């Protein structure tokens, strides 16, 4: 059972909650959309905005509804106390307003998401989103007063003392300024304000102390005036509800010196007025401020008034003084003893608990028969004649430890547990347990004639081999003609060749899967390959052969004097055919210069990378003031920064 509500989350105002949810939507959802995008993408963009905003509002509303206690589920004391402090109907209406707003926000989001599914353009979807968020904001602004009220209730609930209605409790009550708070400060460490004027205590204060290793709580209640309940204010009603609902020992304080501002007659009259609230409670009347006046110093009329209090059953009068702490601990201890005794008495009165205990300790006794014959215990004669065990007797009955000692003692002798088996035949005791396979006993499937069956199978195999049942296909081929055999072998060779070609083609396709295909113009083709291919197609290659021979004779190299003068040697002609050198290493003398060049290139790329440029030609200038964050009026009056 919850006793304190200090962990309720803060309830923001309507404007603050609106800012929180809309800022969260702006931060956690995409912000860029173009009219050229697909219409499905535009719809999804704005539907996400509406759904995300709805989820933000619902999350905030759920925190409020789950944080505050349900006034119908708490203890009656806390329920009446909250009704007195916060007005129960107002509290329920405020929470109901929040719950209704949650339902309305969900309905708005559902309706506008349905409309956004059929949006025809970016402008139309944007206006629908704007209308949805606007309606949610309107619903939120209508919660201005309930949210302010709930925040005040939350703050006050967090300051309420933690009062356990079911623990051991001493309840201090009486007129104002009779010494209730002073007594609480004397018996506990509670820091209660004490002043010489009335109504210093305006709420319930709780202090704790230990008595006989048990934890007690003492509650200081505000002062009560003798008037009808309908005329009492909220301060007095807190005391009334505490007396009515808490199982405790009530300490009714009185001031005989009348320095509190109320006469003895008024204090006695107040006791009789609230006496119906003391039902099923132990009550003590504590006369305080005995350092000023004692009961013996009163006149007979006032003493008779005090004696009238004793007419209430179980009431005991004690005296004390909180100034010099006279008899303070005695009053506390006496109240604790009365409380413990009453709690034990209430437990014993509970019939259910007593019945459960009696059922546990019930002992059954046999009843005598109708004939009245005395039936004594029967002991068999064989048991009476059993010879007592004597370790020194050589003819004694051997025990298990005697057998163990004869066979080497503990750690050497291994007892056979199967000797204790109770079977029809003692020869079965040491039988080997059969194996179980798939839930069946393997021994049940063993055939005693298995050897004879095996011999029969072997004879049948020999007969089949003699009849040629297992002859191979090679023997059948030997009986065929040579032409048929040759035809079969050619077909088999063709099939094998076809399979190899298919495998090679598949490997080629797999090898070229992630590589560039060499263009046909770059592939080297010799004249002999072309001649062989054209001949296979049936073309006459004699004309091409003569042209090839003439071209080869013309290009045959002969060195002349001009070639020597102008340097047209073999190396100059074949320079273009040589393998080109690595351009990355051209102009670099050694590895140290290569490393230095790499460092300088990396240094020059640093600034470009810092500016997030794609390359040296990237000159794109991004917007320094994003329009969606800085558009709108910024006047002196109301402004909209969205």
UniProtKB/Swiss-Prot annotation:
The keyword Metal-binding does not apply. One of its GO terms (molecular function) is GTPase activity. Residues 609-621 have a biased composition (Basic and acidic residues). Keywords: GTP-binding, Nucleotide-binding, Nucleus, Ribosome biogenesis. InterPro entries: G_OBG, GTP-bd, NOG1, NOG1_N, NOG1_Rossman_fold_dom, NOG_C, P-loop_NTPase. Its main location: nucleus. Residues 585-642 are annotated as: Disordered. It is found in: Nucleus, Nucleolus. PROSITE patterns: G_OBG. One of its GO terms (biological process) is ribosomal subunit export from nucleus. GO terms for cellular component: cytoplasm; nucleolus; preribosome, large subunit precursor. Residues 168-340 form the OBG-type G domain. It comes from the Eukaryota. GTP binds at residues 174-181, 220-224, 288-291. Involved in the biogenesis of the 60S ribosomal subunit. Belongs to the TRAFAC class OBG-HflX-like GTPase superfamily. OBG GTPase family. NOG subfamily. This is Nucleolar GTP-binding protein 1. It comes from Eremothecium gossypii (strain ATCC 10895 / CBS 109.51 / FGSC 9923 / NRRL Y-1056) (Yeast). The gene is NOG1.
């Amino acid at each position: 059972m919850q006793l304190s509500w200090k962990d309720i989350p803060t309830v923001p105002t309507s404007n603050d909650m609106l800012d929180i949810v809309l800022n969260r939507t702006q931060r956690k959802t995409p912000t860029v959309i173009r009219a050229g995008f697909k219409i499905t993408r535009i719809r999804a963009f704005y539907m996400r905005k509406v759904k995300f905003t709805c989820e933000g509002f619902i999350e905030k509303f759920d925190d409020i509804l789950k944080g505050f206690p349900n006034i119908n589920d708490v203890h009656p004391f806390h329920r009446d106390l909250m009704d007195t402090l916060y007005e129960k109907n107002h509290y329920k209406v405020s929470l109901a307003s929040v719950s209704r707003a949650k339902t309305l926000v969900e309905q708005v989001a559902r309706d506008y998401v349905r409309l956004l599914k059929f949006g025809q353009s970016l402008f139309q979807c944007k206006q629908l989103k704007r209308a949805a968020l606007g309606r949610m904001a309107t619903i939120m602004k209508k919660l201005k007063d309930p949210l302010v009220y709930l925040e005040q209730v939350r703050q006050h609930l967090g300051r309420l003392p933690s009062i356990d209605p079911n623990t051991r409790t001493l309840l201090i009550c009486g007129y104002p300024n009779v010494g209730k708070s002073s007594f609480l400060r004397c018996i506990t460490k509670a820091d209660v304000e004490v002043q010489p004027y009335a109504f210093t205590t305006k709420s319930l204060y709780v202090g704790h102390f230990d008595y006989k290793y048990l934890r007690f709580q003492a509650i200081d209640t505000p002062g009560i005036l003798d008037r009808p309940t309908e005329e009492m204010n909220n301060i007095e009603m807190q005391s009334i509800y505490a007396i009515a609902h808490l199982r405790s020992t009530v300490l009714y304080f009185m001031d005989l010196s009348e320095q509190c501002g109320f006469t003895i007659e008024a204090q006695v009259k107040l006791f009789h007025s609230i006496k119906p609230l003391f039902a099923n409670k132990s009550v003590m009347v504590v006369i305080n401020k005995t350092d000023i006046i004692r009961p013996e110093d009163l006149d007979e009329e006032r003493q008779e008034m005090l004696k009238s209090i004793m007419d209430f059953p179980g009431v005991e009068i004690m005296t004390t003084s909180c100034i010099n702490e006279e008899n303070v601990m005695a009053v506390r201890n006496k109240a604790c003893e009365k409380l413990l005794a009453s709690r034990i008495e209430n437990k014993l009165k509970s019939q259910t608990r007593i019945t459960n205990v009696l059922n546990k300790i019930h002992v059954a006794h046999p009843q005598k028969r109708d004939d009245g014959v005395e039936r004594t215990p029967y002991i068999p004669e064989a048991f009476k004649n059993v010879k007592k065990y004597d370790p020194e007797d050589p003819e004694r009955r051997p025990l298990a430890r005697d057998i163990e000692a004869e066979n080497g003692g503990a750690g050497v002798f291994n007892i056979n547990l199967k000797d204790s088996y109770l079977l029809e035949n003692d020869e079965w005791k040491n039988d080997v347990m059969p194996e179980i396979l798939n839930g069946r006993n393997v021994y049940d499937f063993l055939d005693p004639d298995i050897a004879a069956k095996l011999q029969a199978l072997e004879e049948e195999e020999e007969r089949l081999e003699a009849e040629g049942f297992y002859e191979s296909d090679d023997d059948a081929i030997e009986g065929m003609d040579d032409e048929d055999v040759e035809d079969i072998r050619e077909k088999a060779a063709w099939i094998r060749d076809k399979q190899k070609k298919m495998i090679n083609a598949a490997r080629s396709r797999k090898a070229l899967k992630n590589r560039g295909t060499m263009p046909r113009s770059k592939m080297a083709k010799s004249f002999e390959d072309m001649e062989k291919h054209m001949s296979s197609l049936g073309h006459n290659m004699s004309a091409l052969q003569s042209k090839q021979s003439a071209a080869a004779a013309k290009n045959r190299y002969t060195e002349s004097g001009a070639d020597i003068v102008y340097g047209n040697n073999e190396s100059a002609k074949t320079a273009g055919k040589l393998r080109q050198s690595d351009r990355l290493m051209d102009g670099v003398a050694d590895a140290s210069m290569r490393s230095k060049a790499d460092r300088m290139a990396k240094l020059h790329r640093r600034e470009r990378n810092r500016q997030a440029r794609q390359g040296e030609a990237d000159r794109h200038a991004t917007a320094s003031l994003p329009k969606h964050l800085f558009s709108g009026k910024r006047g002196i009056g109301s402004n909209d920064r969205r």
